[in-house]
Amino acid sequence: MEFSPPLQRATLIQRYKRFLADVITPDGRELTLHCPNTGAMTGCATPGDTVWYSTSDNTKRKYPHTWELTQSQSGAFICVNTLWANRLTKEAILNESISELSGYSSLKSEVKYGSERSRIDFMLQADSRPDCYIEVKSVTLAENEQGYFPDAVTERGQKHLRELMNVAAEGQRAVIFFAVLHSAITRFSPARHIDEKYAQLLSEAQQRGVEILAYKAEISAEGMALKKSLPVTL
């Protein structure tokens, strides 16, 4: 998936109020960007990092510029816009770039399901196959090439795992899909040191038939695509 129009470059001054970030452009202008990420963004928002941002043509937006990528001072590319995780996953499924999720004839988004009134990110369907429920999570937390999720305690994420376990118990296919959006990550694990309950539930989910997949995106200032399966250790 290519960025169109092309992203523009700036240097991060600070992120604040969760949804805002101040940057300085190469020609010395200071801009305030919308930050589409409510998480901790650990390691993704260090002052001095290069920021790649898009610009909306919607004149009614108070902040027309959106922070899309960070290029860390070590050179790693990180997608901080969490909306891209679902977009890239959908593109990869439709292109059959994810072998484990190929061979389905129908893809539906945001389908209501479960006893806790959830919406599944994607449902895949095909004749003579169980429905496949896919919950997508964006992974950007990295420590020494190890990717982790979540970067903060997530009761919502815990709920999704419970829902997926129920789906698997009903004989349908249940998948938790970790979209790794950090170019330095080479392997994935749940962040037990941040959310022990989530890590416990993920292990329980696997034992109860929920499939765990992690795929890494190739990221540059020109575009992104999910390409490579990564090893998962619970």
UniProtKB/Swiss-Prot annotation:
Residues of the DNA-binding region: 201-220
Family: Belongs to the SfsA family.
Purpose of the protein: Binds to DNA non-specifically. Could be a regulatory factor involved in maltose metabolism.
Protein name: Sugar fermentation stimulation protein A
Keywords for the protein's UniProt record, in alphabetical order: DNA-binding
High-level lineage: Bacteria, Pseudomonadati, Pseudomonadota, Gammaproteobacteria, Enterobacterales
GO molecular function, one term: DNA binding
Keyword DNA-binding: yes
Originating species: Shigella flexneri serotype 5b (strain 8401)
